[in-house]
Design a protein with these regions (language model features):
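C-terminal motif of bacterial Sec signal peptides marking the signal peptidase cleavage site
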Residues: 16-17
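A structural signal for conserved, well-ordered secondary-structure elements
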Residues: 23-172
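Short, conserved catalytic or interaction motifs in soluble domains
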Residues: 20
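Sec-dependent signal peptide recognition
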Residues: 2-9
Length: 172
């Protein structure tokens, strides 16, 4: 009986104290990368993830991201990153496909789709005009509005993405 009490008194507190740490590695990088090549679903702007080829360099690096608001899907950037994107210009970015990646693995894809466009985009999109006018950009579903018939998968709040941003103090 004394042995059982010993095990209970010794090992249970030891097991409780050995909490498993589920932190992500600190070298996780979230980036926006332009696509060099991709295919779309027939009759749609939906990008087939299996077909994408990422550009070698990132358009928006992790160090450029100040914060992300999961409720509004807004990314807040450094002033220098915002200025660099504004300098590229909405005309050059409009229609360009991108991927949000974690360590160069796509989480979701989308397009830079300017608000001056009269074309519909049935996929994830970012208005490049926002780079010249605000300190943030919003990742949206569908342009000019979202309709359930578009069947756009919503990975904007991917749990691994949120965990990385939370760990690094970049989640609003």
């Amino acid at each position: 009986m004394k042995i059982i009490k010993f095990y209970i008194l010794f090992f249970i507190p030891l097991l409780i104290a050995c909490k498993h740490d589920e932190q992500l590695p600190s070298n996780q990088k979230v980036e926006f990368i332009l696509l060099d090549s991709y295919e779309t679903k027939l009759g749609s702007k939906a990008i087939l993830e299996s077909s994408i080829i990422l550009n070698d360099s990132s358009l928006i690096e992790y160090s450029d991201i100040i914060a992300y608001d999961p409720e509004t899907h807004r990314f807040f950037l450094t002033a220098s990153a915002n200025q660099a994107l504004a300098k590229i210009g909405s005309e050059k970015l409009h229609g360009k496909a991108f991927a949000l990646t974690i360590n160069r693995e796509p989480v979701y894809t989308g397009y830079f789709w300017a608000a001056f466009s009269s074309s519909i985009c049935d996929w994830v999109n970012v208005d490049p005009l926002s780079f010249a006018n605000t300190t943030f950009f919003e990742v949206k579903l569908g342009y000019p509005w979202y309709s359930p018939e578009m069947q756009i998968p919503d990975n904007r709040n991917d749990q691994i993405l949120l965990d990385i941003l939370q760990q690094d103090g970049k989640l609003k």
